[in-house]
């Protein structure tokens, strides 16, 4: 699968950003940028065009839930699918992500197949 969609990967750990970026690239999604927290992500989202956000939940300054809320209340950004990626597998986090408008949720560690499947499913639901 190859597509020209642009991804923003948000995680406070550079190693995790690099892993997600490489997994996306291996899945045919080669256009990606990175941000270290929700504040940096919002700045990039408001100043560049992105098609998909993959974000960690637990980050300093602005966590993934706060970032999701900011994206969903912004008229120019609310259409963006947001995939929450976290080490937390708590039911309340999964429910909060869904209620907040996240397009999906996966738990670390995950495989390339899991990430690719979730991204592809979200894109199909969006008609992309």
Located regions from the model:
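Two-component/phosphorelay signaling modules centered on CheY-like receiver
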Residues: 14-33
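C-terminal output helix
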Residues: 110-120
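Short amphipathic alpha-helix used as the core "switch/output" element in two-component signaling
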Residues: 43, 65-78
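Helix N-cap/capping motif at the beta->alpha junctions
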Residues: 34-43, 64
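Receiver (REC) domain active-site loop signature in two-component systems and cognate sites
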Residues: 59
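Active-site beta3 strand of CheY-like receiver
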Residues: 48-54
């Amino acid at each position: 699968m190859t597509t020209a969609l642009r991804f923003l990967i948000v995680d406070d750990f550079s190693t995790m950003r690099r892993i997600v970026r490489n997994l996306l690239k291996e899945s045919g999604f080669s256009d990606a940028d990175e941000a270290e927290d929700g504040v940096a992500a919002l700045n990039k989202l408001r100043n560049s065009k992105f098609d998909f956000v993959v974000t960690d939940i637990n980050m300093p300054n602005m966590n993934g839930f706060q970032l999701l809320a900011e994206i969903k209340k912004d008229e120019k950004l609310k259409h963006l699918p947001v995939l929450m990626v976290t080490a937390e597998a708590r039911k309340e986090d999964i429910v909060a992500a869904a209620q907040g408008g996240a397009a999906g949720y996966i738990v670390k560690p995950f495989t390339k197949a899991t990430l690719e499947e979730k991204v592809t499913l979200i894109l199909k639901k969006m008609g992309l």
